[in-house]
UniProtKB/Swiss-Prot annotation:
Belongs to the methyltransferase superfamily. RsmC family. It comes from Shewanella baltica (strain OS195). Its EC number is 2.1.1.172. It catalyses: guanosine(1207) in 16S rRNA + S-adenosyl-L-methionine = N(2)-methylguanosine(1207) in 16S rRNA + S-adenosyl-L-homocysteine + H(+). The keyword Cell inner membrane does not apply. This is Ribosomal RNA small subunit methyltransferase C. The keyword Methyltransferase applies. Pfam families: MTS (PF05175), MTS_N (PF08468).
Length: 347
C-alpha cells in the first residue's frame, strides 16, 4: 500500500522514464521499488530507520537502499549524480533546506527536482523555501490531499558540510554544563525541557551497561556520562539526524558511547543494567501509544536482575497503566504539572 504522497508520484511517473532516480526521506512503503517500472535505477535514502527496514529487503542491482543523514561517499566533490531527485517534504520544516541542498549536490545540471508532501505538512510554502540555485517551483499535481512541485537545478549549490547545519549551545543541567550539538530537524528548546529536567534532577546511580532510548541530540547521554563517566552507554534512536546530533554532542564533550539506529528495541541485543529515557510518546496518538506499549514490554525483558528502569512520561496520558501492567510494583519518584517520573528496579 502506497502512502498518499507516493500515490501522487506514481500519477506523475512518466517524467522519470529511463532516469537514474534518487529518493530522499521516503516513507514506509515501496514507492522506490514501484518506480523501477519506468526508471532505469533508483537509490533511496531513509532518514527514519523504520522506513529503511520496510524497503531494504527489496534491494537489488537496480534498487539501492540507505539509511542516514547522507548518502555514503568517499569524496564530497565526487558525489553520485542523478537525473531526478524526489524529496518527501519533511514533517520538521527546518529540515527542508538541508534536503534541498543534498538534492542539489546529487543532481546533474538542469536535473529534475520533484517535491511531494501533504497539504497540512507545510509544502504550500515550497516556492518560498526553494534555494536560488533551483528554478521557481511549479505545481504539477494536487491530489490525495497532497501537492507535487517540480523544479530543475539551474545554478551551483554549496557543497554539503554537516557543520553548516548544526547549532551548538551550552546547556545547564543538574550534572553541570554540557555542550549540545543540534542538527536541523531535531527537537530542541535550547534549554532543558520539563520532562528531561525532571529526569536529570532525579538521576539514579547506575553501573555497567546502560541504554538511552530515543536519545535525540544526546542531552541525557551527555549529562549521564558527565555524572557517571565509567558507564558503558548505548544510545538508540529511529531518526538519522538525531543519531548524528548525538554523536556530535558526545564528541563535543569528549565522551564516548555506542550510538546506533533501532526500531524500538529491535536492534538492541542482550540485557541492560539500566534503561533511561524521555521517550517520544507525548502526543497521545493511537500509533504512538502502541509504540509506548512495545517499548515498555520489550524493555522489561531486557532488564538485568537488579537493573534500574527510569522514564519520564506525560502525566495526562495512560502510560501509567501500561507500565503498571508490565512491571507491577513501581514508584513515581517525582512529578510536575506535566510529567511523571517512573522508577523500577528488577529484584
Amino acid at each position: 500500500m502506497l502512502t498518499n504522497p507516493s500515490q501522487v508520484i506514481i500519477r506523475n511517473q512518466d517524467s522519470l522514464s529511463q532516469h537514474k532516480v534518487l529518493v530522499l526521506n521516503h516513507e514506509a512503503d515501496l514507492l522506490p521499488k514501484a518506480l523501477l517500472d519506468v526508471a532505469a535505477s533508483v537509490d533511496a535514502l531513509a532518514l527514519d530507520y523504520h522506513h529503511y527496514l520496510h524497503l531494504a529487503p527489496h534491494a537489488n542491482s537496480k534498487l539501492r537502499c540507505y539509511f542516514g543523514h547522507d548518502l555514503p561517499h568517499q569524496d564530497p566533490l565526487e558525489r553520485e549524480k542523478y537525473d531526478t531527485v524526489i524529496v518527501y517534504f519533511p514533517k520538521a520544516k527546518p529540515l527542508a533546506p538541508y534536503l534541498f541542498n543534498l538534492a542539489a549536490n546529487h543532481l546533474v545540471p538542469n536535473g529534475q527536482l520533484l517535491v511531494v508532501g501533504e497539504n497540512k505538512g507545510g509544502i504550500k510554502s515550497l516556492v518560498k523555501l526553494l534555494p536560488e540555485y533551483f528554478a521557481t517551483g511549479m505545481k504539477l499535481d494536487n491530489a490525495r490531499h497532497c501537492l507535487l512541485f517540480g523544479s530543475s537545478l539551474e545554478g551551483s549549490a554549496p557543497a554539503m558540510k554537516l557543520s553548516d547545519w548544526v547549532s551548538q549551545y551550552q546547556l545547564s543541567t543538574p550534572q553541570g554544563e554540557i555542550s549540545i550539538c543540534n542538527l536541523v530537524g531535531v527537537f530542541s528548546e535550547k534549554r532543558l525541557d520539563l520532562g528531561t529536567e525532571l529526569l536529570l534532577s532525579h538521576l539514579p546511580t547506575l553501573s555497567g551497561r546502560v541504554l538511552d532510548f530515543g536519545c535525540g541530540a544526546g542531552v541525557i547521554a551527555a549529562a549521564l556520562l558527565k555524572a557517571q563517566p565509567s558507564l558503558s552507554l548505548e544510545c538508540v534512536d529511529i531518526n538519522a539526524m538525531a543519531l548524528a546530533s548525538c554523536e556530535l554532542t558526545l564528541a563535543a564533550n569528549g565522551m564516548t558511547a555506542k550510538v546506533y539506529p533501532s526500531d524500538g528495541l529491535a536492534q538492541t541485543t542482550g540485557k541492560f543494567n539500566g534503561i533511561i529515557s524521555n521517550p517520544p510518546f507525548h502526543d497521545g496518538l493511537a500509533s504512538t501509544t502502541s509504540i509506548a506499549q512495545n517499548f515498555v514490554t520489550d524493555s522489561a525483558k531486557q532488564l538485568q536482575h537488579n537493573g534500574i528502569w527510569q522514564i519520564v512520561a506525560n502525566r495526562h496520558l495512560p502510560y501509567s497503566d501500561i507500565i503498571a501492567a508490565e512491571f507491577g510494583q513501581l514508584k513515581v519518584v517525582a512529578d510536575n504539572n506535566k510529567y511523571k517520573l517512573y522508577y523500577f528496579q528488577h529484584k
